[in-house]
């Protein structure tokens, strides 16, 4: 049985931990507001750009003059998986959900006889995926968004992906990230970015009369210029969504940890009081027994 001194030390230790988790919760809540605003602001632009490009690309799909980012390499052999996680932990299942999804995709592709490459974006992706898929890992990115995600960082990731595609190092690229739903809910999203997925009903995606486009210069030249920018835009969106999801998950995890610490303190306090009461009772019995012996 723990002594009163041990119980007091445990209570002090848990109270100290509660202060830390409470502070981390408040910091995450503050960062969440900024990250959520940024993610929600970027989402409509990225979605609109996808729809517009889908409409434009639909007319070129299958044609010999279509940009490679639409037509692809003509093969489906090598897949690049871009796993977006955080650099730090203490955010519940945020990182593990991406790692599980990436592992599931990797295992499925390998089972189909495909070749895979994994680009980790975030320290946790690198640390956790290299245990089972270290031989497939390539150079990735860490320490992004220390003061908030900026477009230049997303463009850096997109540029490396584009360079690899131009060098024919892969055929298909899929980004795996957490889409922000709320502070307590994130959705694992798998988004194919290369080749650009042309919706079957792209021309019918907009309500109302269909837009008529005039191209200057040619449609192919415009798409060849816009598609790499769209890749950077989609990466920017993925990083913003991931950052908002991370802060929401961390705030929720620290809130739960703070509550659990409070429950533990109450339980230890009850145990301490009972032990102290038992010790006092024992001492009283010893005094009374000694007095009776006299």
From Swiss-Prot:
It is a peripheral membrane protein. This is ATP synthase gamma chain. The lineage of its organism: Bacteria, Pseudomonadati, Pseudomonadota, Alphaproteobacteria, Rhodospirillales. GO terms for cellular component: plasma membrane; proton-transporting ATP synthase complex. Belongs to the ATPase gamma chain family. Its main location: membrane. The keyword Protein biosynthesis does not apply. The gene is atpG. It is found in: Cell inner membrane. PANTHER family: ATP SYNTHASE GAMMA CHAIN, ATP SYNTHASE SUBUNIT GAMMA, MITOCHONDRIAL. F-type ATPases have 2 components, CF(1) - the catalytic core - and CF(0) - the membrane proton channel. CF(1) has five subunits: alpha(3), beta(3), gamma(1), delta(1), epsilon(1). CF(0) has three main subunits: a, b and c. It comes from Paramagnetospirillum magneticum (strain ATCC 700264 / AMB-1). InterPro entries: ATP_synth_F1_ATPase_gsu (IPR035968), ATP_synth_F1_gsu (IPR000131), ATP_synth_F1_gsu_CS (IPR023632). The keyword Ion transport applies. GO terms for biological process: proton motive force-driven plasma membrane ATP synthesis. One of its GO terms (molecular function) is ATP binding. Keywords: ATP synthesis, Cell inner membrane, Cell membrane, CF(1), Hydrogen ion transport, Ion transport, Membrane, Transport. It comes from the Bacteria. It holds the Pfam family ATP-synt.
């Amino acid at each position: 049985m723990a002594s009163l001194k041990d119980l007091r030390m445990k209570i002090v230790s848990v109270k100290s931990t509660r202060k830390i988790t409470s502070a981390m919760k408040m910091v995450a809540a503050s960062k969440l507001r900024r990250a959520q605003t940024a993610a929600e602001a970027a989402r409509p632009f990225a979605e609109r750009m996808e729809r517009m490009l889908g409409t434009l690309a639909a007319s070129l799909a299958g044609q010999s003059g279509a940009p490679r980012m639409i037509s692809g390499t003509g093969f489906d052999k090598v897949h690049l998986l871009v796993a977006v996680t955080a650099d730090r932990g203490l955010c519940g299942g945020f990182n593990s959900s991406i790692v599980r999804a990436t592992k599931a995709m990797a295992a499925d592709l390998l089972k189909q006889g495909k070749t895979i490459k994994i680009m980790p974006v975030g320290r946790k992706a690198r640390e956790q995926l290299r245990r089972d898929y270290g031989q497939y890992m390539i150079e990735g990115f860490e320490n992004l968004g220390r003061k908030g995600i900026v477009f230049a960082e997303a463009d850096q990731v997109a540029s490396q992906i584009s360079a690899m595609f131009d060098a024919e190092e892969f055929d298909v690229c899929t980004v795996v990230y957490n889409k922000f739903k709320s502070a307590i809910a994130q959705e694992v999203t798998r988004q194919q970015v290369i080749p650009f997925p042309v919706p079957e009903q792209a021309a019918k995606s907009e309500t109302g009369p269909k837009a008529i486009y005039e191209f200057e210069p040619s449609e192919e030249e415009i798409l060849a210029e816009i598609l790499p920018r769209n890749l950077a835009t989609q990466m920017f969106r993925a990083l913003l969504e991931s950052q908002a999801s991370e802060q929401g998950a961390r705030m929720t995890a620290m809130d739960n940890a703070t509550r659990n610490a409070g429950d533990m303190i109450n339980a230890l306090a009850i145990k301490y009081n009972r032990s102290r009461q038992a010790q006092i009772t024992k001492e009283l019995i010893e005094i009374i027994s000694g007095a009776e012996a006299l």
